[in-house]
Amino acid sequence: MVFCGLFSELIKGHSSSNNNGTNVSLAKTIQTNIRSQYSSDLSSYASACKKYSSLKSFDSLLHERTNSIISSLAAQAKTRSLNIESLMEVYGYLLELNQDTVRVIIESKEDVLKNNDLKALVDVYFKSTSKTLDFCNTVEKCVKKAEISQLIIRFAVKQFETETVDTDLGESKKKKYVKTLEEMNKFKAMGDPFDGEFVTQYKSVYDEQVLLLDELRKLKVKLGKKLRNIKTWRILSNVVFATAFVTVFVLSVVAAAMMAPPVLSAVASGLTTPIEVVGMWCNKMWKEYEKAVKRQRGLVLTMELGVQANNVTMVNIKFEVENLSIRISSILKTVNFAVDREENEMATRFAMQEIKKKVEGFTEKIEEVGERAANCSKLIALGRLVVLGHILGLHIVEGGAANIISSV
């Protein structure tokens, strides 16, 4: 869905610098006018929720899940910056919404098969999920690079242990750890596999997904009069709209919170007020978000300027909180320490002992991120296959539907 496609680059954009020192302008990305642009669509959605019990149930579940993710992120923001675990939690939320939409499309099977206009709506689903798959592929490529880095540093540790017990110093004592240092230089040359392309694409993809939301609105206007009395059209179009709209909201909140964490607390506090009118909770959330962003706008822009002025080192940048990159950065620093003091045996021994402590956590995090990316890619691909099968009337993928739904 649009929502998964949006998040697919958020994790790429949480860092503010790439290899060339350029910055992703998150402050310019933050959306504050979406609610006013889609006010009529929100009213239409609220009316449809009152009319159709299935849509009302969907709205209740969407509301509950959105409350949960915003509250969870707000709690995290009180004690620390948002990190990769936070972003993966958001990704899980968006993935659940994707599966909910798959269910709705499957339930609308017969009508979609008979109606070319409804197929156009489903096209929006395929456009957005293709972005999600691209993201998963990017993550998996970075994980493979990280795995190579891990093998190199593990070999360096093994080499160090061998050279430590080697009493045959040969020509000079300073050459005792020469092979260890060679391997560490290789690791250093690999750099951070999660830097570069991985952290620079958020802005462009975010804009593209907002345009996709606008495309959806135009499609609704075009077909709305023609299909206004068709129950399936009203339910399906409102499900797609609501999930797309809420996704833009959640990702806008996260983008703002990376600059100014108080935005999350302000939005979360607004969720505690009961909302009487079904379907209008998302409108209220946007209001709270807009007020919070206006209050924090100066801080957001100030912090962005601070990032631009202080991107000399990753560890001093507020947004470089992704745990795997931090582990890699930590190991790289220790490698630099050893390499810069290659003639000092004690320095090398100290550095290698530190690396041995850090490499286990590095390995575990690589595996975790790789498994997450592979699983998400599989679920999204299967969801696309299930939807396509239902549109074409191919029942060979019925088993896949059960699998994807049970995976949520």
Swiss-Prot record:
Keywords: Membrane, Transmembrane, Transmembrane helix. The keyword Membrane applies. GO terms for cellular component: membrane. It is a multi-pass membrane protein. The chain crosses the membrane at residues 239-259, 262-282. Its main location: membrane. It holds the Pfam family DUF677. It is found in: Membrane. The keyword Transmembrane applies. Belongs to the UPF0496 family. This is UPF0496 protein At5g66670. It comes from Arabidopsis thaliana (Mouse-ear cress).
